[in-house]
Design a protein with these regions (language model features):
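C-terminal alpha-helical interaction appendages
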Residues: 2-148
Length: 148
């Protein structure tokens, strides 16, 4: 497996840039256009991969190390959490409007998210359930105040 770590002369994205960009578009759309972040993380991940291969690790192990660098502090997605809450509890937000609504409510919902120590392991913590309950109430109030 060849992993391209630099942009080609044709302007194509590297494997790590493409992988991260697709993930950001799906789970962190509010930062998907952060080109400097994508470039820096892709470069770091490629470097990690290359060092791991030089150190004799398998391709699978090297990719695991590179992924740890690529997705650091991005594993928990505020957008995905809002989207799941809206999908489960708010049928008045039609499926075709759901992503746009979630993007709209994401910034105001930061008042809820900021109360929690969110990191890559947060989703498996007991506090995640509490956040989800609080977020549901916040979104209900938001809809009552501003509508869908």
């Amino acid at each position: 497996m060849t992993i391209q770590d630099k942009n080609t002369t044709t302007g194509e994205l590297s494997y790590f840039e493409t992988t991260l960009l697709l993930y950001l578009k799906e789970s962190h759309p509010h930062i998907a256009d952060a080109k400097a972040l994508v470039r820096a993380r892709a470069d770091e991940a490629a470097g990690s991969y290359e060092r791991a291969i030089r150190d004799g690790l398998s391709v699978t192990q090297a990719l695991e190390l590179a992924d740890a660098v690529l997705y650091q502090d991005l594993r928990f997605s505020r957008f995905d959490t809002v989207f799941e809450v809206v999908s489960e509890w708010f049928p008045e937000v039609r499926p075709e409007k759901r992503a746009d609504f979630c993007l709209k409510v994401l910034s105001p919902a930061e008042t809820v998210f900021s109360k929690y120590p969110i990191d890559d392991r947060f989703e498996s913590s007991p506090a995640c359930h509490t956040l989800t309950v609080e977020l549901t109430g916040f979104i209900q109030s938001y809809i009552e105040q501003y509508g869908v």
